[in-house]
């Protein structure tokens, strides 16, 4: 008998509810085709939670997430809540506390150039023609963003500001394991990004990554300095499989990876803890300007579901089925408005219907 899974669904604001509805259609198709027992509960988060409960992350939402196997998150924020105090705004008051509460230390951001979308890639046509499929694995809770001491002191010409890059062995070991385990599900290559020619923290990073690599003899490991990595991503992104990055370097490279795909509407994201519990969300924002118009691209939300299936439910076949269905839709020229470039475009609902049907059919 198959295991029972429960997913906390947090649609949020803007286009969140529209694109989430499409992901849930696809989840229905996965249930049927793979005989998976998946239940869901829906909770308010972000601006809608402020309106309904007076707080961007209500206690009931947190408790519901605690009872779930994973969180499928939409998007939060919008002009309506921009004038609230920063800590009460949807983004800072909901997403960051969720990451902290569940100790989500790793961020996974896939960046893939899909066949038929090469024209959207800002790289040279001959580079785009080679395609790329990269997974950026970023450490989320350590490094210079959180290291102490940090601050400002002094005055006049002696005024100074300082931040501290700190990494502990356990922090590097656990993010490295995420990268190597991810590579085993892909093309078995990890490129670890550092600045070991200058920084002590990067020297330790490289030493520990080398140690972890010994337990993954089936995965190829390469090291690359951050400055070279930013150039190589432009020169030949097809050389990369999994990028393993510290918090700061991952912040930079994950956005560069996203930009060279040419479409934020295609990019999912996963944040995981040590137990495999994760929060899965589109990399883009709530897009309030197009909310309610049935024109948003739901693929990033649907791909977030695929990541959830792969990393939190260990349902790799189901995740692959979703990715194959999306590939088929795009290869057949099915496009939402952001990808149509003047050609006929389908609605948000229609794109969800097509992908769900292809998942059910087993393309």
Swiss-Prot record:
GO biological process: L-leucine biosynthetic process
UniProt pathway annotation: Amino-acid biosynthesis; L-leucine biosynthesis; L-leucine from 3-methyl-2-oxobutanoate: step 3/4
Location(s), subcellular: Cytoplasm
Cofactor: Mg(2+); Mn(2+)
Enzyme Commission no: 1.1.1.85
Keyword Hydrolase (UniProt): no
Details of cofactor binding: Binds 1 Mg(2+) or Mn(2+) ion per subunit.
Primary location recorded for the protein, binned into one broad class: cytoplasm
GO cellular component assignments: cytosol
Keyword check for Oxidoreductase: yes
Record InterPro entries: IsoCit/isopropylmalate_DH_CS, IsoPropMal-DH-like_dom, Isopropylmalate_DH
Sample GO molecular function, one term: NAD binding
Disulphide-bridged cysteine pairs: none
Catalyzed chemical reaction(s): (2R,3S)-3-isopropylmalate + NAD(+) = 4-methyl-2-oxopentanoate + CO2 + NADH
Family per similarity comment: Belongs to the isocitrate and isopropylmalate dehydrogenases family. LeuB type 1 subfamily.
Site (Important for catalysis): 145, 195
Binding-site residues, substrate: 99, 109, 138, 227
Residues annotated for Mg(2+) binding in this entry: 227, 251, 255
Binding site for NAD(+): 78-91, 285-297
Subunit structure and binding partners: Homodimer.
Keywords for the protein's UniProt record, in alphabetical order: Amino-acid biosynthesis, Branched-chain amino acid biosynthesis, Cytoplasm, Leucine biosynthesis, Magnesium, Manganese, Metal-binding, NAD, Oxidoreductase
This protein's name: 3-isopropylmalate dehydrogenase
Pfam families: Iso_dh
Function: Catalyzes the oxidation of 3-carboxy-2-hydroxy-4-methylpentanoate (3-isopropylmalate) to 3-carboxy-4-methyl-2-oxopentanoate. The product decarboxylates to 4-methyl-2 oxopentanoate.
């Amino acid at each position: 008998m198959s295991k029972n899974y429960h997913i906390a669904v947090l649609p949020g604001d803007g286009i969140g509810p529209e694109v989430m509805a499409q992901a849930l259609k696809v989840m229905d198709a996965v249930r049927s085709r793979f005989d998976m027992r998946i239940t869901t509960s829906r909770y308010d988060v972000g601006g809608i939670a402020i309106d309904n409960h007076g707080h961007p992350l209500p206690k009931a939402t947190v408790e519901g997430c605690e009872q779930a196997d994973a969180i499928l998150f939409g998007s939060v924020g919008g002009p309506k809540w921009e004038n609230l105090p920063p800590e009460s705004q949807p983004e800072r008051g909901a997403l960051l506390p969720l990451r902290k509460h569940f100790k989500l230390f790793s961020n996974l951001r896939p960046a893939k150039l899909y066949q038929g979308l090469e024209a959207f890639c800002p790289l040279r046509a001959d580079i785009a023609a080679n395609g790329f499929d990269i997974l950026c694995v970023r450490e989320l809770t350590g490094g210079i963003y959180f290291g102490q001491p940090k601050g400002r002191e002094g005055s006049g010409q002696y005024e100074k500001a300082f931040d501290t890059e700190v990494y502990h062995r356990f922090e590097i070991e656990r993010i490295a394991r995420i990268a190597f385990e991810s590579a085993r599900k892909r093309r078995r290559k990890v490129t670890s990004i550092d600045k070991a020619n200058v920084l002590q923290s990067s020297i330790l990073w490289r030493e520990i990554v080398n140690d972890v690599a010994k337990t993954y003899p089936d995965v190829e490991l390469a090291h690359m300095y951050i400055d070279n990595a930013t150039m190589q991503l432009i020169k030949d992104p097809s050389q990369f499989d999994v990028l393993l990055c510290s918090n700061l370097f991952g912040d930079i490279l994950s956005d560069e990876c996203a930009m060279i795909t040419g479409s934020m509407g295609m990019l999912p994201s996963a944040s995981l803890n040590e137990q495999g519990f994760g929060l899965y969300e589109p990399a883009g924002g709530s897009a309030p300007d197009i909310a309610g118009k049935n024109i948003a691209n739901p693929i990033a939300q649907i791909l977030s579901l695929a990541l959830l299936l792969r990393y939190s439910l260990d349902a790799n076949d189901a995740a692959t089925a979703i990715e194959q269905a999306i590939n088929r839709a795009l290869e057949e020229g099915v496009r939402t408005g952001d990808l149509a470039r003047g050609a006929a475009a389908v609605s948000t609902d229609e794109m969800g219907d097509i992908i769900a049907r292809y998942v059910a059919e087993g393309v």
